[in-house]
């Protein structure tokens, strides 16, 4: 449809006459330069000038810096003015979209990296919350934990850590929504809620954790392949997986989210299938061993260790493995800057975490204890000469079930790649956060036009080269070191999240602020955060004891200490170094001095109540199945 109305005559930046037409069909603005030889006869330009740039050129241009220059800002401002001149309601529509959408009710008083693209949808967030973390720790590392603790010790360790995790995710969900405009999420909370030095140390240790996880997962992937073949050099597979992870992340947040959606769907389906098959095998419905029941809880036993002290050490050692296995659950906070609707996505993901803890972790761990004896020589960490494999594969293969173990191993491989993908994505965003906080060189804050922190991604890719040790005879030792750094660092990070939440709530109370300003309130509140914080401090103390006096040994072992507790000296060195450099010796920021406005999204309590009431009304008037889904999800 052509525009027959008389055009408005305005001047553009080039001082040339510009015609602007308002079409009736779609109310879009069409404009082009008058007198230009490039003016099309049938289709107007949607912009000052539309270049027929090739796909290759657009791809390379996407790596250029996303920051707007002064001229670009002027042009963008004038474009908005031109839009308002034609349709005065369009500016109002933009304001409504920006300020009154369901995920942005209230005042945006913070700062974020606007160049990061909001391409992560609620469905992505749900699957990231449910499936991320189902990787090396749960699917492979549990073999070592089962050897050290036995089936009962393994279950106790995961149950304790699961109760802690639920409190952590509730606190994390509350602050992630309030600080949804803060790039890096909880990695930045301690700096302005607790103390700068503490925030600096935790931020760098957490970044180091995910830098270690990527090569750890790639090494694990090569170990998983050994179930099928040992004749091919493991580094060949490392190269393939390394290139795959980098390729996925080249597509930015959308590539990461879509890949995780696929990976996590496969993982959850596999865990569901294993749960069903495991029950069938245990009662004698499949396999060659008939009814198994709880036989392995009696022979070789529920706990590993002749003495009570060794059994206790086994449970403590399991806690670190469990922390690593649960690691990544907090990714819902890292991705808030790239979520399209965090107010809907984050509370739902935090609520559904209980299903992940109970079903994906505790239920399957109970089955592992029923199906795999802790003295199996195929478990990682055992002294036997058997080919090492995931305990989930052993649980099926050792009882004579064929074919299925290959499918399980294939999904485990996907799970490991999923964690490698998540760790690569996270470490790059964490470098970006460190740079924006002034904790790392500014070069890491480079974001290209596609929303990728390009320089930070390069550092993550460089660090992942450690994975090429897979062909080394010290492969399992490298695995142990990387796992220890990652697991203990996770405890530091979770402690920082809970401590930040306690300080945040304390500041809200001291400064007389209403909790109605929060878009989502933790179901466990300050008591849940206090419980989690105290428990993690006790776990760190117990782990220190296990590190200097390993299981089964009465003497001190320096090598074992650094293998299990290396992250602690790093944290202390970073904290003390920051304090000495800045000559700042305060332990906490006073509650009345905490800045509760900067970075924070202040929600309108009345609008939130109105929106929630409208949602409940829709549920009451809707079909019954929607009410059921809303209750559980």
Curated annotation (Swiss-Prot):
Description of post-translational modifications: Palmitoylated by PFA4.
Induction details: Induced by transcription factors DAL81 and STP1, which are activated by a signal initiated by the plasma membrane SPS (SSY1-PTR3-SSY5) amino acid sensor system in response to external amino acid levels.
Keyword set, alphabetical order: Amino-acid transport, Cell membrane, Isopeptide bond, Lipoprotein, Membrane, Palmitate, Phosphoprotein, Transmembrane, Transmembrane helix, Transport, Ubl conjugation
Gene3D superfamilies named among the record's database cross-references: Amino acid/polyamine transporter I (1.20.1740.10)
Residue intervals annotated with topology Extracellular: 146-148, 219-231, 282-313, 374-392, 474-477, 553-557
Bias (Basic and acidic residues) ranges: 92-101
Modified residues annotated as Phosphoserine in this record: 6
Gene Ontology CC terms: plasma membrane
Keyword Ubl conjugation applies: yes
GO MF, one annotated term: amino acid transmembrane transporter activity
UniProt entry tagged with the keyword Transport: yes
Cross-link (Glycyl lysine isopeptide (Lys-Gly) (interchain with G-Cter in ubiquitin)): 11
Membrane topology, Cytoplasmic segments: 1-124, 170-197, 253-260, 335-352, 414-452, 499-531, 579-633
Ranges where the record places region Disordered: 1-54, 87-116
Sequence ranges of Polar residues compositional bias: 34-54
Entry's localization field: Cell membrane
Covalent lipid adducts (S-palmitoyl cysteine), residues: 633
Membrane topology: Multi-pass membrane protein
Transmembrane segments: 125-145, 149-169, 198-218, 232-252, 261-281, 314-334, 353-373, 393-413, 453-473, 478-498, 532-552, 558-578
Main location: membrane
Free-text function comment from the UniProt entry: Broad substrate range permease which transports asparagine and glutamine with intermediate specificity. Also transports Ala, Cys, Gly, Ile, Leu, Met, Phe, Ser, Thr, Tyr and Val. Important for the utilization of amino acids as a nitrogen source.
Protein family: Belongs to the amino acid-polyamine-organocation (APC) superfamily. YAT (TC 2.A.3.10) family.
The protein's name in its UniProt record: General amino acid permease AGP1
Organism: Saccharomyces cerevisiae (strain YJM789) (Baker's yeast)
Gene from which this protein is expressed: AGP1
């Amino acid at each position: 449809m052509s525009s027959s109305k008389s055009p408005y005559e305005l001047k553009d930046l080039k001082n040339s006459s510009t015609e602007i037409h308002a079409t009736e069909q779609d109310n879009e603005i069409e404009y082009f330069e008058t007198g230009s030889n490039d003016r099309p006869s049938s289709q107007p330009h949607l912009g000052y000038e539309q270049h027929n740039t090739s796909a290759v050129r657009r791809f390379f241009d996407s790596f250029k810096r996303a920051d707007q220059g002064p001229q670009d800002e002027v042009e963008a401002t004038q474009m908005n003015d031109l839009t308002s001149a034609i349709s005065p309601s369009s500016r109002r529509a933009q304001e409504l979209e920006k300020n009154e959408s369901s995920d942005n009710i209230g005042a945006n008083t913070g700062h974020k990296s606007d160049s990061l693209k909001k391409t992560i949808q609620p469905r992505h967030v749900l699957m990231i919350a449910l499936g991320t973390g189902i990787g090396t720790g749960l699917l492979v590392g549990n073999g070592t934990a089962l050897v050290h603790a036995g089936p009962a010790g393994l279950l106790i360790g995961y149950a304790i850590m699961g109760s802690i995790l639920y409190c952590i995710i509730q606190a994390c969900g509350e602050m992630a929504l309030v600080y949804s405009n803060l790039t890096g999420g909880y990695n930045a909370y301690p700096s302005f809620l607790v103390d700068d030095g503490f925030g600096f140390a935790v931020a760098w240790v957490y970044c180091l954790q995910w830098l270690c996880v990527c090569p750890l997962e790639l090494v694990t992937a090569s170990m998983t392949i050994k179930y099928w073949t040992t004749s091919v050099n493991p580094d060949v597979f490392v190269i393939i997986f390394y290139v795959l992870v980098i390729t996925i992340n080249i597509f930015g947040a959308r590539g990461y989210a879509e890949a995780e959606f696929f990976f996590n769907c496969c993982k959850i389906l596999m865990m569901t299938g294993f749960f069903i098959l495991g029950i069938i095998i245990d009662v004698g419905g499949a396999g060659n061993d008939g009814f198994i029941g709880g036989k392995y809880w009696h022979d070789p036993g529920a706990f590993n260790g002749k003495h009570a002290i060794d059994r206790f050490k086994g449970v403590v050692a399991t806690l670190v493995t469990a922390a690593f296995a649960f690691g990544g659950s907090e990714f819902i906070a890292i991705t808030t800057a790239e979520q399209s609707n965090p107010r809907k996505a984050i509370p739902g993901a935090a609520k559904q975490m209980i299903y992940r803890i109970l079903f994906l972790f505790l239920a399957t761990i109970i089955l592992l204890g029923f199906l795999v004896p802790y003295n199996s020589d195929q478990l990682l960490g055992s002294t036997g000469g058997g080919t090492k494999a995931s305990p989930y594969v052993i649980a099926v293969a050792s009882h004579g079930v064929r074919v299925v173990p290959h499918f399980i191993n294939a999904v485990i491989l996907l799970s490991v790649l999923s964690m490698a993908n998540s760790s690569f994505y996270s470490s790059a965003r964490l470098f970006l956060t460190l740079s924006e906080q002034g904790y790392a060189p500014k070069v890491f804050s480079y974001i290209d036009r596609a929303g990728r922190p390009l320089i930070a991604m390069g550092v993550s890719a460089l660090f992942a080269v450690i994975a090429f040790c897979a062909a080394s005879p010290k492969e399992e030792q490298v695995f142990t070191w990387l796992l220890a750094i990652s697991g203990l660092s996770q405890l530091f990070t979770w402690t920082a999240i809970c401590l930040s939440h306690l300080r945040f709530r304390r500041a809200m109370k001291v400064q007389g602020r209403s909790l109605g300003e929060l878009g989502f309130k933790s179901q466990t509140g300050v008591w849940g955060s206090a419980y989690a914080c105290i428990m993690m401090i006790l776990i760190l103390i117990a782990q220190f004891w296990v590190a200097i006096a390993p299981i089964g040994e009465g003497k001190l072992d320096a090598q074992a200490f650094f293998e299990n507790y290396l992250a602690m000296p790093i944290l202390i060195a970073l904290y003390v170094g920051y304090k000495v450099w800045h000559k700042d010796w305060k332990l906490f920021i006073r509650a009345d001095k905490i800045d509760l406005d900067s970075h924070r999204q202040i929600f309108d309590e009345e609008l939130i109540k109105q929106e929630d009431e409208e949602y409940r009304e829709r549920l009451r008037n809707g079909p019954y199945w929607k009410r059921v889904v809303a209750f559980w999800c």
